[in-house]
From Swiss-Prot:
UniProt keyword Transmembrane present: yes
Topology in membrane: Single-pass membrane protein
Protein known as: Photosystem II reaction center protein J
Ranges of compositional bias, category Basic and acidic residues: 1-17
Gene from which the chain derives: psbJ
Spans annotated as Disordered: 1-20
């Protein structure tokens, strides 16, 4: 087991000398999806759902 890991296997927030264990640049980006990708996928999903509603309003039961 690594010296940096605690007894439960987690990496501590700070090193013994007080410095952060993970740099702030990597803390918020490592292992995450970019926000622009999440927003793009969400926007496409919203447009798709609205398209289904508009399609349904012109066809089917409510089309007059």
């Amino acid at each position: 087991m690594s010296k940096l890991r605690g007894p439960d296997g987690r990496i501590p927030d700070r090193l013994p000398d007080g410095r952060p264990a993970v740099s702030w640049e990597r803390r918020w980006t490592e292992g995450t999806l970019p926000l622009w990708l999440v927003a793009t996928a969400g926007g496409i999903a919203v447009i798709f759902v609205l398209g289904i509603f508009f399609y349904g309003s012109y066809t089917g039961v409510g089309s007059a």
